[in-house]
Amino acid sequence: MKRTAFFISDGTGITAETLGQSLLAQFENIQFTKLTRPYIDSIDKARAMVQQIDAAAERDGARPIIFDTIVNRDIRAILDTANGFMIDIFSTFLSPLEQELSSHSSYSVGKSHSIGQHSNYMERIEAVNFALDNDDGARTHYYDKADLILVGVSRCGKTPTCLYMAMQYGIRAANYPLTEDDMERLQLPDSLKKHRDKLFGLTIDPDRLTAIRHERKPNSRYASFAQCEFEVREVENLFRRENIAFINSTHFSVEEISAKILVEKGVERRLK
């Protein structure tokens, strides 16, 4: 079965997309065409959006699923005329909260991601800059300022995990790729030893690692299954020998990996 899903917002669309994606992921037997439509903030844009929704309904033979965080009532009224199954995220959750808290919500456009929260904004920017500056073992002399240091073989998911934790939690995460030289020495590099309490390991299935490396350097020794299998085996042995906690990233999303790491290490998010 195939259905179209729209994530519609008069802001960035982040809230609608994040919640919508999480809900749709529960229906593995259905193939969704997912379309994000941010900044639907005028009557004309709303009318054009209705045309897109109706066209998708006619094409699929089933009405699209609509996740929206539209605040403006006039724009909402126009969207409600579309041939779609509408899920108004704000009204779904805010109305019960208003009753429980005996208070009216501000119901503001872009409130959840407002730059007005200056301290959070600056924490996020600083964390992202830290992740980029300390990517791939680039600046080990700044590890004393890191909240976490991810270690593992090349291309096992360290960089995207560091960037996600920076964006989502304000965590200052560095990453260090373990090389064949590190494996042959059978011990941690000197630059990591004094930061042992910050280390967390990522590993990956060798066949998945081979596929990822082939995209970067096809038909190379670096991407061969034998090399990937060797590196993964040796790095996992190193993790066990040095008593470094680690997880296999193969079957987890970056969101799941990040959450598991923070729980395991007991690191508190900087963004409140």
From Swiss-Prot:
Single GO molecular function: protein serine/threonine kinase activity
EC number assigned by the record: 2.7.11.33, 2.7.4.28
Alphabetized UniProt keyword annotations: Kinase, Nucleotide-binding, Serine/threonine-protein kinase, Transferase
UniProt keyword Kinase, yes or no: yes
Signal peptide, first to last residue: none
A Pfam family that the UniProt record links to this protein: Kinase-PPPase
InterPro entries membership: Kinase-pyrophosphorylase, PSRP
Group of enzyme by EC: transferase
Binding locations of ADP: G152, V153, S154, R155, C156, G157, K158, T159
Catalytic reaction equation(s): [pyruvate, water dikinase] + ADP = [pyruvate, water dikinase]-phosphate + AMP + H(+); [pyruvate, water dikinase]-phosphate + phosphate + H(+) = [pyruvate, water dikinase] + diphosphate
Keyword Metal-binding: no
Protein family per UniProt: Belongs to the pyruvate, phosphate/water dikinase regulatory protein family. PSRP subfamily.
Record-linked HAMAP family: PSRP
Function: Bifunctional serine/threonine kinase and phosphorylase involved in the regulation of the phosphoenolpyruvate synthase (PEPS) by catalyzing its phosphorylation/dephosphorylation.
Name the UniProt record assigns to this protein: Putative phosphoenolpyruvate synthase regulatory protein
Organism: Ectopseudomonas mendocina (strain ymp)
